[in-house]
Design a protein with these regions (language model features):
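Glycan-recognition and catalytic cores of secretory/periplasmic carbohydrate-active enzymes
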Residues: 1-201
């Protein structure tokens, strides 16, 4: 619906979107507590910001802040000392898969957190989430987390940490294999959102 509104600027599209938010607000605590939403909040936070900027409806800001308070701290991940070696050297694929099944999406679980914080596309989504949180709380650290994280990841794992290694995980700096398109697309989107468009080309 938002894509239609951006393309056509029709009030009817915005009305449909506002009706959805009106419905969602009634179960917002459950939505904000969902493990997937907590791990990947960027799309929803960005949508709330855009709708708020257009409509000025205070409820949009309230929903965004409630959601932001429950999400994974991606700015902390992106600005902390990064994993400097390929993740495959820290844990085998079999062990990681078994751990993920056992934890069943628990963000506090060791393997779940390891998988998220060493996944190139997830880190790109996290960069956008940090930027959105920075817009909400005015934190310069969160606003700059995408650039800081990119510089650290690039230093230890090469361009776009998987974008040039055909591996969705942090895999070191070897650029000898093909391109992982999902990762390239995710980071290009993050660069544009973070005002780092020059990195996207």
């Amino acid at each position: 619906v938002w894509a239609l509104y951006e393309a056509e600027a029709k009030k009817e599209d915005l009305t449909v979107l506002l009706r959805w938010f009106q419905w969602a607000a009634k179960q917002w605590d459950d939505i904000a507590a969902d493990e997937y939403v907590r791990a990947f909040p960027a799309d929803l936070l960005e949508l709330l910001e855009k709708v708020y900027r257009i409509t000025g409806i205070p409820a949009m800001l309230k929903l965004a802040r409630t959601l932001s308070a429950s999400t994974m701290n991606w700015s902390g991940v992106l600005t902390a000392t990064p994993i400097q070696t390929p993740v495959s050297k820290a844990v085998s694929a079999e062990e990681l898969d078994a751990g993920l099944k056992k934890e069943n999406g628990d963000l506090e679980g060791y393997y779940t957190r390891l998988a998220l914080t060493t996944n190139a596309a997830a880190l790109a989504d996290g960069a956008r989430a940090a930027l959105a949180r920075g817009w909400l709380n005015g934190s310069a650290t969160e606003m700059n987390a995408a650039k800081t994280g990119w510089e650290k990841i690039s230093r230890y794992h090469g361009a776009i940490c998987g974008g040039l290694t055909a591996n969705p995980m942090l895999a070191g700096g070897n650029p000898s294999t093909g391109i992982f398109n999902d990762t390239l697309g995710a980071w290009a989107e993050a660069f544009v959102c973070a005002g780092m468009g020059a990195h996207a080309v």
